[in-house]
Amino acid sequence: MMKQTIHINCDLGEGGEFDEKLMPLISACNIACGGHAGNLETMHRTVRLALENNIEIGAHPSYPDRANFGRNHMEMTAEELKLSIEGQVLSLKQIVESEGGKLSHVKLHGALYNDAAKDRNISKVVMRSLEDLGDDFRLFVPVNSQLGELALGRFELYYEAFADRNYEDDG
């Protein structure tokens, strides 16, 4: 019989007050890296907490939309979006490495996550951004998403489900 496990991942470094209490309960964290929330101080603090708790560390880039917590679609040129994603992921990657860790994954946040799931052009920009940063990390994607289709075979994928949502047979 095959052993099945649940990988529990949580968005952290977003200004919440329970990051420290959540760390021992999860296997991975997605750290806000400046787009919708977070700054150098919160990234360093959250990375240290994750390393102390032996938690996998992921980047959680978003549209540069702090006013709406990254929940609204933003019109950006492909180049603007690419540079924004690269800048956010690279900032966190450098912090993780400076603290002696390794970036394990990337999970988009909010509207960017949803847009990349549905819009092939946005997915292509995301892929170009991530490929320019290397391929030594996993990518969290929704089932049956444009981003998942494009990333298949290029990145190791984790298909994600949310415990508080209902799902149809197609994911």
Feature locations, PLM:
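Active-site rim beta-loop-alpha module in soluble metabolic enzymes
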Residues: 144-171
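Hydrophobic faces of well-ordered beta-strands that scaffold small-molecule active sites
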Residues: 6-10, 29-31, 57-61, 104-108, ...
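A short alpha/beta connector and helix-capping loop motif
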Residues: 15-43
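Catalytic beta/alpha-barrel core
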Residues: 31-36, 115, 134-144
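Glycine-enriched alpha-helix->loop->beta-strand junction motifs that scaffold or abut catalytic
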Residues: 25-29, 51-53, 129-136, 152-158
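Glycine/small-residue-rich loop that forms an oxyanion/phosphate-binding "nest" at active or ligand-binding sites
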Residues: 66-105
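Charged helix-capping and loop-helix junction motifs
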Residues: 119-125
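Acidic (Asp/Glu)-rich catalytic clusters
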Residues: 20-26, 45-58, 97-100
